[in-house]
Regions:
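N-terminal leader/targeting segments
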Residues: 21-94
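Negatively charged, low-complexity tracts enriched in Asp/Glu with abundant Ser/Thr
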Residues: 26-32, 40-55, 112-113, 135-157
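Ser/Thr-rich, low-complexity intrinsically disordered terminal regions
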Residues: 53-70, 139-167, 173-175
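Long, charged/polar, surface-exposed segments that mediate recognition or autoinhibition
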Residues: 69-150, 154
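Short, exposed beta-strand-loop hairpins at the edges of beta-sheets
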Residues: 183-189
Length: 209
């Protein structure tokens, strides 16, 4: 399942489908989150920054007021690596929405398509917020998503990982699932339940400085 397919599905009507369209993304909240990402302090207005000795290798769920509308869960984490006995990392704000399946792992074709359409609409609404922010430019498009980066000329021409970034990623859900009622001709990459992640990342830094 590629972002392009998701975008096409988002343009199809939802009439007769089971899933409701999620609420549109809040661009004011997006702008606020980017401002916090720029500080490099780990979205401390959303959840308290711990310390360089207590980094968020596990997720800190964000309060409802700071969650992008339409998603199942939002959290803050620290992407950490440790070269030369130092702690480097990049704070990340992540929101995720996943398809809803039955407890048995079964998912009907109609529900699957409706949820993908709704997910596509939600993805487009968030991407519209990113594109409306003139500080961002397209970084790359891949089969799994789209990445935007704050223009380096606005941040002193720092390298890519020294700039705030916004990413939209679509990926298969982990687990065993059974899609029922699907046409035989349905491509394999459209038979798996999917999840959508929106990531707003701050600049990488030496966390011990």
């Amino acid at each position: 399942m590629t972002p392009k397919i998701l975008k096409v599905l988002a343009m199809l009507p939802l009439a007769g489908m089971a899933a409701a369209l999620p609420a549109a993304a809040d661009c004011a909240l997006f702008t606020s989150l980017v401002k916090q990402a720029e500080t490099g302090r780990g979205f401390e207005e959303v959840v308290p920054f711990r310390s360089v000795w207590d980094l968020r290798e596990s997720r800190d769920t964000v309060p409802a007021d700071y969650a992008l509308p339409g998603f199942d869960v939002c959290w803050v984490e620290d992407e950490i690596w440790r070269p030369d006995q130092s702690d480097y990392g990049a704070p990340r704000y992540v929101c995720r929405i996943s398809e809803k399946v039955e407890a048995t792992g079964a998912l009907s074709f109609d529900s699957h398509m409706a949820q993908l359409r709704a997910m596509g609409q939600l993805s487009q609404s968030v991407e519209a917020c990113v594109q409306a922010d003139e500080r961002f430019k397209l970084d790359r498009k891949t089969t799994s998503g789209t990445s935007y980066i704050m223009k380096p000329e606005l941040t002193g021409n720092r390298g890519m990982y020294q700039n705030p970034r916004a990413e939209l990623k679509i990926s298969p859900m982990v687990g065993q699932y059974t899609l029922t009622g699907a046409p035989d001709a349905l491509p394999a990459d459209m038979r798996m339940p999917m999840q959508l992640d929106v990531i707003i990342a701050g600049p990488a830094r030496n966390l011990q400085e």
